[in-house]
Curated annotation (Swiss-Prot):
Binding sites annotated in the UniProt record for Mg(2+): 9
Cofactor binding description: Binds 2 magnesium ions per subunit. The magnesium ions interact primarily with the substrate.
Alphabetized GO MF terms: ATP binding; metal ion binding; methionine adenosyltransferase activity
Keywords: ATP-binding, Magnesium, Metal-binding, Nucleotide-binding, One-carbon metabolism, Potassium, Transferase
InterPro entries: ADOMET_SYNTHASE_CS, S-AdoMet_synt_C, S-AdoMet_synt_central, S-AdoMet_synt_N, S-AdoMet_synthetase, S-AdoMet_synthetase_sfam
Gene3D superfamilies xref list: 3.30.300.10
Protein name, entry field: S-adenosylmethionine synthase
CDD domains per UniProt: S-AdoMet_synt
A Pfam match: S-AdoMet_synt_N
Highest taxon above the source species: Eukaryota
Positions contributing to L-methionine binding: 56, 99, 245, 276
BP GO terms, sorted: methionine metabolic process; one-carbon metabolic process; S-adenosylmethionine biosynthetic process
Length: 384
């Protein structure tokens, strides 16, 4: 038996990069709400007093981009310049063009049946699942995400009146390894850095974070006298949001996925409609991995899929059960082939990916969420 430490982080909805993810997905949702067949590739950048959206959108929808952007920023809680950003006064720049006709003719133009729609680009995507938590997500990532969600909840409901929208969490867990099996033993270290108002003391911040956030989220069995806490360790975090750091869409792809576990193909999710396999392929890979682990076929599972632009059928499917599989990887690949149609149009149909449900995926994680709109989290009963 051996042991090791593993760490995952997360950020709140008010982090500059996460602002951008949410704005990009708010634009996507606004298009899909009027035209479910919208083709959207929307990036966002932000800095002090400014949000810029840029990209390629082909849609029948009539979208007020200024309104969509400001509403997304308002929802996060940036409603006063004292917080580092104000949805009412920020400058919104729009640089949106139509999707390239070269891409359109190769992917979807003239293709009536879902089975014929090609992938919007080449690339490889990964999905991961593990039985160490009920959500079949890694414990490090689960706890980092839940700390963020609790902190955000307490800020919005006024319990933490001193809290501001921008914050980060990080959790280190000690694992033991026996053969191929890994088991989380204890939480080694917790880091929380949260933006705050001018008046609150560090003593109150640290007490509130420990009592109201950490103890509400982390099961007592994982905390002990040796757990290390770094709570606002810099000593001051008044300047936050886009005033403190610039933000870009797609800069938090590991937080969006599995916190460093498994693997990542590099493509971001937010701002992309489901013909973009960076998103739909990654959702499908999670759907597969979670279904395999839920069926007891493995304790842990990594799935890779790859695509070529304009081609419907995936080029490859790969599975790794880390030595925990109850069947061979070849047998599991056959099960995948018999149960999942990974052509992009079929994924859009089976996972209902033309609905305007993506803004809420852009904060708190795309995976491991208990929400019926996250269809890729619904375990599929497998035909063996």
């Amino acid at each position: 038996m051996s042991s090791y430490l593993f760490t995952s982080e997360s950020v709140t909805e008010g982090h500059p990069d996460k602002i951008c993810d949410q704005v990009s997905d708010a634009v996507l949702d606004a298009c899909l709400a009027q035209d479910p067949l919208s083709k959207v590739a929307c990036e966002t950048a932000t800095k002090t007093g400014m949000v810029m959206i840029l990209g390629e959108i082909t849609t029948k929808a009539n979208v007020d981009y200024q309104k969509v952007v400001r509403e997304a920023v308002k929802k996060i809680g940036y409603d006063d310049s004292s917080k580092g950003f104000d949805y009412k006064t920020c400058n919104v720049l729009v640089a949106i063009e139509q999707q390239s006709p070269d891409i359109a003719q190769g992917v979807h133009i003239g293709k009536v049946n879902p089975e014929d729609i090609g992938a919007g680009d080449q690339g490889h995507m990964f999905g991961y699942a593990t039985n160490e938590t009920p959500t079949l997500m890694p414990l490090t990532h689960f706890l980092a995400s839940e700390l963020v969600n609790k902190l955000t909840e307490l800020r919005h409901n006024g319990t933490l009146a001193w809290a501001r929208p921008d914050a980060k969490t990080q959790v280190t867990v000690e694992y033991k390894k026996e053969g191929h099996k890994i088991t989380p033993v204890r939480v080694h270290t917790i880091v929380i850095s949260t933006q705050h108002d001018e008046k609150v003391t560090n003593e109150q911040i640290r007490a509130d974070l420990k009592e109201l956030v950490i103890k509400a989220v982390v099961p007592a069995q994982y905390l002990d006298d040796n757990t290390i806490y770094h709570l606002n360790p810099s000593g001051r975090f008044v300047i936050g949001g886009p005033m403190g750091d610039s933000g870009l869409t797609g800069r938090k792809i590991i937080i969006d996925s599995y916190g460093g576990w498994g693997a990542h193909g590099g493509g971001a999710f937010s701002g992309k409609d489901a013909t973009k396999v960076d998103r739909s392929g990654a959702y499908a890979a999670r759907w597969i991995a979670k279904s395999l682990v839920a069926a007891g076929l493995a304790d842990r599972c990594l799935v890779q899929v790859s695509y070529s632009i304009g081609v419907a059928k995936p080029l490859s499917v790969f599975v790794d059960t880390y030595g925990t599989g109850k069947k061979t990887d070849a047998e599991i690949l056959a099960i995948i082939d018999n149960n999942f149609d990974l052509r992009p149009g079929c994924l859009m149909r089976d996972l209902q990916l033309t609905r305007p449900i993506f803004q809420k995926t852009a904060s708190g994680g795309h995976f491991g969420r208990n929400d019926p709109d996250f269809t890729w989290e619904t375990v599929k009963e497998l035909k063996m």
